[in-house]
């Protein structure tokens, strides 16, 4: 699966796309474009400059900022599974190895009956994508993404929950390099090409989760005020 084919699978047809490069000083620069062909040109230029290359999962209304309020549509659900040993935190990440993560992912899809996802080896972990046959509005996508996060927790699949439901998330572009260790860059490659599924079919397999909103504060009646010693003059 080539880079262009991957982007065609995961990006909606409408809106602005965003590709980002991160240089060796960790400076991240976003580039908004309005075609996949132009995105490929940007990816190749960043790769030739020895930069880490990312794509924004959403499309955007305006080519201005990569924030939730500016997001337009989604065409994927995703998971970010970290693997290996975190030398800074001195502990193992989600899984010790990528093979262990893939075994856990297979068990998860078997149990939940979710289709086999498109799987990307990010160099240091595993990225999973469930593409839709059609894009959906961000308001429709959000509760299903939250549901996927809770489904992972329910069945014990370790993944970055904050990433799963983050409308403005960026992830690595396949066909590029992971330069976290500049001396030993690792390839970002597609391990499995999943099939696009109608959004409604995926949503039926995922318990919808609506983020709880704070309840409106009810005014106290006079009897309750008296019991609590509530003095309205305070």
Model-flagged regions — what are they?
Residues 126-127, 180:
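Flexible loop/turn segments at secondary-structure boundaries
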């Amino acid at each position: 699966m080539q880079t262009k084919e991957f982007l065609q699978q995961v990006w909606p047809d409408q809106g602005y796309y965003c590709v980002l490069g991160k240089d060796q000083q960790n400076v991240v620069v976003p580039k908004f474009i309005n075609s996949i062909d132009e995105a490929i040109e940007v990816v190749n230029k960043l790769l030739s400059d020895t930069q880490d290359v990312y794509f924004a999962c959403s499309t955007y209304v305006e080519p201005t900022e990569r924030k939730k309020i500016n997001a337009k549509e989604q065409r994927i659900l995703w998971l970010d599974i970290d693997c290996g040993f975190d030398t800074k935190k001195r502990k193992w990440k989600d899984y010790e190895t990528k093979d262990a993560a893939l075994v856990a992912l297979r068990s998860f899809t078997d149990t939940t009956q979710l289709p086999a996802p498109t799987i990307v080896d990010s160099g240091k972990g595993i990225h999973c994508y469930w593409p839709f046959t059609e894009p959906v509005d961000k308001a429709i996508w959000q509760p299903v993404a939250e549901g996927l996060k809770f489904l992972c927790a329910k069945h014990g699949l370790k993944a970055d929950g904050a990433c799963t439901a983050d409308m403005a998330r960026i992830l690595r572009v396949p066909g590029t390099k992971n330069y976290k260790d500049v001396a030993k860059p690792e390839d970002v490659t597609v391990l499995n090409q999943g099939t696009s599924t109608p959004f409604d079919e995926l949503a039926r397999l995922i318990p919808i989760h609506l983020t709880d909103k704070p309840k409106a504060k009810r005014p106290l009646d006079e009897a309750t005020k008296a019991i609590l010693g509530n003095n309205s003059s305070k």
